[in-house]
């Protein structure tokens, strides 16, 4: 059996620009992609914390160190500059491998500064 697992996550990044007329995709600072292990042209799901929109696109690299998160093409209708996003990439793997899998998670502050990375998500407490 194959399972779909979280592979990489950018947690709480802010949109820096939107471009409705760009060909599509989401441009992401190359440092951010590296931190979460997301590759250029990889499929990503984006969850907009501010408006509840959930949409899929693919990642393209923005200039390293730029802190850019640019939502482009039709997806630009799903976000505004300043919106808070969670960006995820997933992987399929065999059940046995999935049981030992740990995602790469990158956490950001309100200025899109990388704060830390982790190989697991915290346990949610009651």
From Swiss-Prot:
Heterooctamer of four alpha and four beta subunits. This is Aspartate 1-decarboxylase. Keywords: Autocatalytic cleavage, Cytoplasm, Decarboxylase, Lyase, Pantothenate biosynthesis, Pyruvate, Schiff base, Zymogen. The modification Pyruvic acid (Ser) is found at residue 25. Catalyzes the pyruvoyl-dependent decarboxylation of aspartate to produce beta-alanine. The gene is panD. Belongs to the PanD family. Pathway: Cofactor biosynthesis; (R)-pantothenate biosynthesis; beta-alanine from L-aspartate: step 1/1. It comes from Sodalis glossinidius (strain morsitans). GO terms for biological process: alanine biosynthetic process; pantothenate biosynthetic process. It comes from the Bacteria. GO terms for cellular component: cytosol. It catalyses: L-aspartate + H(+) = beta-alanine + CO2. The active site is at residues 25, 58. HAMAP family: PanD (MF_00446). Substrate binds at residues 57, 73-75. Is synthesized initially as an inactive proenzyme, which is activated by self-cleavage at a specific serine bond to produce a beta-subunit with a hydroxyl group at its C-terminus and an alpha-subunit with a pyruvoyl group at its N-terminus. Its cofactor is pyruvate. One of its GO terms (molecular function) is aspartate 1-decarboxylase activity.
């Amino acid at each position: 059996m194959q399972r779909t697992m979280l592979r990489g996550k950018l947690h709480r990044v802010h949109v820096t620009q939107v471009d409705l007329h760009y060909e599509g995709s989401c441009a992401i600072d190359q440092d951010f992609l590296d931190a979460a292990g997301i590759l250029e042209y990889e499929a990503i799901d984006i969850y907009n914390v501010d408006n509840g929109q959930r949409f899929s696109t693919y990642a393209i690299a923005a200039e390293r160190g730029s802190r850019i998160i640019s939502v482009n093409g039709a997806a630009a209708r799903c976000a505004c500059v300043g919106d808070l996003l969670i960006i995820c990439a997933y992987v399929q793997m065999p059940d046995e491998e999935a049981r030992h899998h740990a995602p790469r998670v990158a956490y950001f502050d309100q200025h899109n500064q990388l704060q830390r990375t982790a190989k697991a998500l915290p346990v949610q407490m009651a």
